[in-house]
């Protein structure tokens, strides 16, 4: 169960992996983009994972229609606003929404910097007067290669004051972290944090590389850390967080079933691991499902779940005063 006396956070949540099917339909019609279906029910199998995909890259293809329909910057702004509406509807107190400006821009010839500006504007507009707080994490989509990621980074750094971190996501096998060392030097020079997708498609060495060469303070997924006890000790001792995404790891076939998921072992080891959604619309789940269904299936007790909930606040990219304010707010409701 979710402890409502603690803040509820989702700090690994892809904005461009959470585009409503209805919105895809409406934007497709608006921009005369041919979609694989003309109603929500028929569209769902094309934009949502129904059965586990064979691998990460097959899973990621389900996100494509959500960005294919982004025909102008107002469309980008719209999905940013709807992401905040969805987070508030779920009772989330704080979200870190991550997005890849190049991925969102490329299908309809938008400029990544314009996408960044539109997303920031949408988030600022939607959070005014809302019960959910939000920060943004920019993504470098490694799948497009080193040069495109530099363009993407340039677009993000133009608005660095509106971001809390930069992430590296996409094809971990085809484009390993070693290719992006120079990019993350620029990230740290801009005084932004780094959270890296690692140990999802590759093994523990990918996580070591993310920490040692890319300066990661958090690891997205990090499932393969379980293979290396020294790494688990290091994550615990250096307080490097793991953003676990239970259902996602099943749907990408990173883990075969939840009973085998290492989140419970991470928590038992003292690692600051937490529970997140990843791509809610694509997975057909929300944060409540991860806490009430997926976490118990992964062997977590109520105490484990509350620990994971508290860990999310501890590793969130928030100031001490902001964390304290969230704790105070939650404790009095």
From Swiss-Prot:
High-level lineage: Bacteria, Pseudomonadati, Pseudomonadota, Gammaproteobacteria, Alteromonadales
Binding site for Zn(2+): 12, 14, 197, 278
Protein origin, superkingdom: Bacteria
Catalytic function, reaction form: adenosine + H2O + H(+) = inosine + NH4(+); 2'-deoxyadenosine + H2O + H(+) = 2'-deoxyinosine + NH4(+)
Function: Catalyzes the hydrolytic deamination of adenosine and 2-deoxyadenosine.
Annotated protein name in UniProt: Adenosine deaminase
GO BP: any one term: hypoxanthine salvage
Keywords assigned: Hydrolase, Metal-binding, Nucleotide metabolism, Zinc
Cofactor binding note of this UniProt entry: Binds 1 zinc ion per subunit.
Residues annotated to bind substrate: 14, 16, 170, 279
Residue numbers annotated as active site: 200 (proton donor)
Family statement: Belongs to the metallo-dependent hydrolases superfamily. Adenosine and AMP deaminases family. Adenosine deaminase subfamily.
One cellular component term from this protein's GO annotations in UniProt: cytosol
Keyword Metal-binding: yes
UniProt-recorded Gene Ontology molecular function terms: 2'-deoxyadenosine deaminase activity; adenosine deaminase activity; zinc ion binding
EC number, UniProt record: 3.5.4.4
Site residues, Important for catalytic activity: 221
Cofactor(s) needed by this chain: Zn(2+)
Pfam families: A_deaminase (PF00962)
């Amino acid at each position: 169960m979710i402890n409502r006396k603690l803040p509820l956070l989702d700090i690994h949540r892809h904005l461009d992996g959470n585009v409503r099917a209805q919105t895809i339909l409406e934007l497709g019609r608006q921009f005369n983009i041919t979609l694989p279906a003309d109603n929500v029910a028929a569209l769902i199998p094309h934009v949502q994972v129904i059965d586990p995909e064979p691998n990460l890259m097959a899973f990621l293809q389900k996100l494509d229609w959500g960005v294919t329909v982004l025909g102008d910057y107002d469309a980008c702004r719209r999905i940013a606003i709807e992401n905040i509406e969805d987070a508030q509807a779920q009772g989330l107190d704080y979200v870190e929404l991550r997005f890849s400006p190049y991925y969102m821009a490329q299908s309809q010839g938008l400029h990544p910097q314009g996408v960044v500006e539109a997303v920031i504007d949408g988030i600022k507009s939607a959070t005014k007067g809302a019960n959910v707080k939000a920060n943004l994490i920019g993504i470098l989509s490694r799948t497009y290669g080193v040069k495109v990621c530099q363009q993407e980074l340039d677009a993000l750094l133009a608005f660095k004051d509106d971001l809390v971190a930069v992430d590296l996501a996409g094809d971990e096998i085809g484009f390993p972290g070693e290719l992006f060392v120079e990019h993350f030097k620029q990230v740290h020079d801009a005084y932004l944090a780094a959270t890296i997708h690692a140990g999802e498609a590759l093994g523990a060495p990918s996580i070591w590389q993310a920490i040692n060469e890319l300066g990661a303070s958090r690891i997205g997924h990090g499932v393969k850390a379980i293979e290396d006890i020294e790494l688990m000790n290091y994550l615990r001792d250096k307080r490097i967080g793991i953003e676990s995404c239970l259902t996602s790891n099943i749907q990408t076939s990173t883990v075969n079933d939840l009973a085998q998921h290492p989140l419970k072992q991470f928590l038992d080891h003292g690692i600051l691991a937490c529970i997140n959604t990843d791509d809610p619309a694509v997975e057909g789940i929300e944060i409540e499902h991860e806490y009430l269904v997926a976490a118990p299936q992964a062997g977590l007790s109520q105490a484990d779940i509350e620990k994971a909930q508290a860990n999310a606040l501890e590793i969130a990219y928030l100031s001490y005063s902001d964390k304290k304010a969230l704790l105070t707010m939650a404790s009095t409701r």
